[in-house]
Swiss-Prot record:
The lineage of its organism: Bacteria, Bacillati, Bacillota, Bacilli, Bacillales. This is Probable transaldolase 1. Pathway: Carbohydrate degradation; pentose phosphate pathway; D-glyceraldehyde 3-phosphate and beta-D-fructose 6-phosphate from D-ribose 5-phosphate and D-xylulose 5-phosphate (non-oxidative stage): step 2/3. The keyword Disulfide bond does not apply. One of its GO terms (molecular function) is aldehyde-lyase activity. The active site is at 83 (schiff-base intermediate with substrate).
Amino acid sequence: MKFFIDTANINEIKEANALGVLAGVTTNPSLVAKEGVDFHERIREICNVVEGPVSAEVISLEADKMIEEGKELAKIAPNVVVKVPMTTEGLKAVKAFSDLGIRTNVTLVFSAVQALLAARAGATYVSPFLGRLDDIGHNGMDLIRQIAEIFAIHGIETEIIAASVRHSVHVTDAALNGAHIATIPANVIASLVKHPLTDQGIEKFLADWEKTQEK
């Protein structure tokens, strides 16, 4: 499973990229708005930092306007992926983008049949939202597993991005259940590195080393 970071903050992206594990970036209008910067310029900045896919989301809800927006976003850099909501109009736009050779990430997926529809429309990626399903008492991992099984049975190459990741258990379970990618906030990426036994082990090694130096 590959790791993407879910942010529009350049410093967070650079820090994650320095770890050597970052394969891509996902953004959304809320994340960019939080940064208080020009949307297109920030996507361009991100694409200059990361070589992998960078998802940039359309704002419009009508297919023709989504297509116009997506074409402009795709011009920013070759690694831009146009992010489209899972709606009837979104599917129309995804088909058009597929015909144009523009990669897409269908977001706000909450059922396996939505993922299948997106894949058949030509989506490069589908993004089921784990945390938001958990919030309403549903099991997001069941959804990941269902999508992975359906795609495997039917030979579908669309990749599954586990989104709305809240903690390290989401990451582990997504990997076990067939997600190709997890897109993760910076704070969760930082938590993945840490384990109390690792810290204890380092402290013990250092303490033992200090003892040898005292002799």
